[in-house]
Amino acid sequence: MIDDNKVDDALEYLRTNASKAAQARAHKVYVEEFRKTVKAQQMALRLNLPVNAQEREAYASEEYQKHLLAIKDAVYQDELNRWGMVAATSLIEAWRTQNANSRSQGKMQ
């Protein structure tokens, strides 16, 4: 049986972490989109090269590599929040099913 206190904790987790999860998602989207800006800035530093060489050098740049690490961190935080929310929601759903089953068994007796 799932303890009511665990359900209360799950509900509290959902309530208190909603803003944090939204911020993590917004940051993830931002850094993913900003990747294009980093690439463009790096390509602009090499206007003397053909476009495909500019792109190659932009991808190989230290700034682009650092930005990829920022994307990695943002995705990790977003997924950590998402799976915390999924776990809390799943616990609540299991508790609801458990209670519905208990009620239906009580009516059968």
Spans of model-derived segments:
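Extended alpha-helical coiled-coil "stalk/arm" regions
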Residues: 28-56
